[in-house]
């Protein structure tokens, strides 16, 4: 399988600003994050809660994590999903990217669709998990997750709110 590159993704040009009233540091560098959109045969997708002690603790998101120096998105996603939720992924496709300006970090989320994996889900960081369909029933949803729910809704011709 070829390494996924950031240029393969469909990107949105704007940066979504979250909690705009909160202060930000001017010297923040862009943090690259690999995110897995795991989709079962019935169309359900996996959301996990952010662990205790992390920013936005308890918010629901797609699993993943930061790229380490020299890693591709695919390598980082494979490592993160093994470390965080105990699975080994098969093929993954870089699908979309989104830049989010949070008060604590400026991030580029690199979303990969994953339809093949092995192993049982084990939440190694104390988080919860839920297989969801649209509209999602878990709350609250992390702001960086909302665009993905909207993209899934477009692909599935889903009408209505994607989340509470």
Give the location of each predicted region.
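HhH-family (HhH-GPD) DNA N-glycosylase catalytic core used in base-excision repair
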Residues: 2, 88, 154-158
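Intrinsically disordered, low-complexity terminal tails and inter-domain linkers enriched
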Residues: 4-23, 162
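Conserved N-terminal beta-strand and adjoining loop/helix that marks the start
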Residues: 14-45, 66, 97
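Active-site-adjacent beta-strand/loop module that shapes the phosphate/pyrophosphate-binding cleft
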Residues: 40, 98-121, 128
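Conserved Nudix-box catalytic region and its N-terminal flanking loop in Nudix hydrolases
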Residues: 44-83
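A short coil-to-beta-strand element that immediately follows conserved catalytic motifs
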Residues: 87-97
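NUDIX/MutT-family hydrolases
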Residues: 113-115, 121-156
